[in-house]
Amino acid sequence: RAALAAYGPGPLDPLAAAHAVAAGLPEDAVVVEEAITTGLRLRQVLRQDRPGSYLHTVGGGLGHGIGAAVGRRMGDDSRPVVAVLGDGCAMFGLQGLWAAGHYRVPVTFVVMNNGEYRTLKETLDTWDSRSTRGGRYLGLDLAFGPDSGRHRLDFRAAAEFFGIEAVRVSHPAELTEIVAKSASATAPLLVDVPITGHTPPR
């Protein structure tokens, strides 16, 4: 509630975004989650008790989320599939959107977009602060242009490249409504969700 109450125009608080996804999930939905930092918040608010309703990998590998969601939906079309992905995780398996678009696999892909590999930045801050002096995190901003970190990647454009409809949301209620519609989806959809949490300059 605190996250929702604090919401204002602009990127969503990660906890508010997680609540919005959980609130919209159809009762029989399968969640494929590969969102390292936002996933922690999502697991706090999910209320699923049906076996096979939550798919997540363990260990250090990245990039399974998009492909796992497409495969899960193609293998069993009796349940809606919602993939919750971090922007960094999505970059490791973005080509999986080709299969979703080509075969019209009705998965709802929710990309939590904070514009960076946040968990790696946090690791560097904790274990190796020497390499981040001056606020430089080389290669860890998912951005472009001379003002790196300010222009987040546009996942709508990426989805559209693969023939997938895409939207960007700026309010929790919008996200809840879109996730709820996954129950009757007949085609893939990507939802680009700008979230807060960008690592500030040090």
Residue ranges and their predicted role:
Residues 1-35, 135-142, 158, 166, ...:
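Phosphate/pyrophosphate-binding active-site segments
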Residues 1-76:
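Active-site diphosphate/adenylate-binding microenvironment
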Residues 41-47, 67, 94-97, 119-125, ...:
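Short acidic, glycine/serine/threonine-rich loops at helix termini
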